[in-house]
């Protein structure tokens, strides 16, 4: 099995997957715009504390927490409470198979 190195990458394969390591200092707000994906996404908290909103529900994440957003769920990082490190991973694309952050009203679901 190959080892894939690097903190942020995409896999050049038909099913596409992406992952990355995110680091943010305390005090940030509205880090990402409300968006959705044509895949599921997992956010694994490593250190710090932050708030995310998914489908209009606010969550405070701390080390060891995992937030799962399903394909089409609108979500965003709303506040970095403490210096934060998290790992995110996206599954294979489904539906229209579009990559990146998709915005309701701009990118039809």
Give the predicted meaning of each segment:
Residues 71-97:
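Ligand-binding loop in jelly-roll beta-barrel domains
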Residues 96-109:
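Acidic/histidine-enriched, glycine/proline-rich intrinsically disordered or flexible terminal extensions
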Residues 56-72:
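Short acidic-glycine-tyrosine-enriched beta hairpin
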Residues 42, 49, 58, 74, ...:
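Structural motif
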Residues 36-52:
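Short, conserved beta-strand element in jelly-roll/cupin
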Residues 1-34, 39-40, 89-91:
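A short glycine-rich, His/Asp/Glu-containing loop-to-beta-strand
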């Amino acid at each position: 099995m190959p080892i894939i190195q690097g903190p942020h990458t995409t896999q050049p394969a038909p099913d596409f997957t992406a992952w990355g390591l995110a680091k943010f200092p305390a005090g940030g707000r509205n880090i990402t715009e409300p968006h959705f994906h044509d895949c599921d996404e997992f956010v694994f908290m490593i250190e710090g504390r932050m708030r995310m909103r998914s489908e209009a529900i606010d969550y405070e994440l701390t080390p060891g927490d995992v937030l799962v957003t399903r394909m089409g769920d609108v979500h965003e990082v709303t506040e970095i409470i403490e210096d934060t490190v998290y790992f995110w991973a996206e599954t294979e694309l489904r539906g229209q198979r579009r990559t990146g952050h998709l915005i309701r009203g701009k990118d039809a679901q």
